[in-house]
Amino acid sequence: MTKDMETIVSLAKHRGFVFPGSDIYGGLSNTWDYGPLGVELKNNVKKAWWQKFITQSPYNVGIDAAILMNPKTWEASGHLGNFNDPMIDNKDSKIRYRADKIIEDYMLNEKGDENFVADGLSFDEMKRIIDEEGIVCPVSGTANWTDIRQFNLMFKTFQGVTEDSTNEIFLRPETAQGIFVNYKNVQRTMRKKLPFGIGQIGKSFRNEITPGNFIFRTREFEQMELEFFCKPGEEIEWQNYWKTFASQWLKDLNLSEEATRLRDHDADELSHYSNATTDIEYRFPFGWGELWGIASRTDFDLKKHSEHSGEDFQYHDQETGEKYIPYCIEPSLGADRVTLAFLCDAYDEEGVEGSKDSRTVLHFHPALAPYKAAVLPLSKKLSGDAIKVFEELSADFAIDFDESQSIGKRYRRQDEIGTPYCITFDFDSLEDEKVTVRDRDTMEQVRMPITELKSFLAEKVKF
């Protein structure tokens, strides 16, 4: 089926996945609050990442670094000088745009070229394309543009009681730098030898010029980042390892392989710190978008922090006697983006066999589903006994309890929020201590002893 972004966003709002931020005050541009189901979904995504990339990895450990860091961090990393977007203003509408994004949108919508990438073009090259193609502002309809200028993406604030330059600090634009400055602390305390990785999940902030597409591009977002340190010369081998590992993680969680692709960055597209980068992209209803950037950052970060701080980041290889600054592979995944990808991928509208009705269903992998099961008493008279099943299961799983409306409507409601299994407690359950378990995807029903429910669900949520 052809999926429509507006329909998916409507479902997300209607069913409590995502709400507009500050809604009662008219909202705040491009801010979103995760509702009861959305926070469960996103937490499950983060849990799945941590499980495979940290807990079950023989190489990696985790940290949780502070959002606010010494401003010298951002001088060393290059963010204060180089973390910019190309900005262009329409003189008639007074609206500011990212020059690369209005070019890419034009190429997609007017030329049908979904593979065009403007990132890496010079300001002059972008302005020439805008002028030659006659790209207009979507609001004013005119091509009356300013020159392209740099726009720093970091949010600035102040620490302490006075607002002057000596108290300037920044909300971090990425979680990576918190890992790099803690490299020696982790390596020493955990007695790690190369290769090894440090991962974390946390909020980052970028003052994007043109955020949009729901939760895909926002100014406040969450990252799941791994910095994997290795011997120089082995970085491409390890980059390939993490490309395969990341792709398999998505596949294991049932993200459509047909809707994902790996795209290598061209030489002129590479970031200043990278000698190789591959993006894992997903085909959203609005087009292809990056989920995961898997970059070889070389020794850029540790070397820069060593130069600015005076700290020696050399690694002493006891096997060879060599000393060197490790190279780093960074698989960086957007938690909000991949959550949106799982939501879009799971969305389906399908006919019901033997009926004129259709149903909306979210085919989440059980490990990601907000609720693993819903306990449904066939009658409110059975609620007192059915709640005991809920209490037993909810000690280990996220379980819904729903006693309102007909059983058919309750099935449809659970399908629409992605609950894999509905457990119906009926009058026979009082006698045989069994329940009817309905599968979300097949709609098949089986009779099962209540005592087997825990082991059944535990097996199903594995991935």
Curated annotation (Swiss-Prot):
Name of the molecule in the record: Glycine--tRNA ligase
GO cellular component, one term: cytoplasm
Superkingdom per UniProt: Bacteria
Coiled-coil ranges per UniProt: none
Primary enzyme class: ligase
Binding site for substrate: 98, 174, 221-225, 330-334
E.C. number(s) listed in UniProt: 6.1.1.14
An individual GO BP term: glycyl-tRNA aminoacylation
Organism encoding this protein: Staphylococcus saprophyticus subsp. saprophyticus (strain ATCC 15305 / DSM 20229 / NCIMB 8711 / NCTC 7292 / S-41)
Residues binding ATP, per UniProt: 206-208, 216-221, 290-291, 334-337
Predominant localisation class: cytoplasm
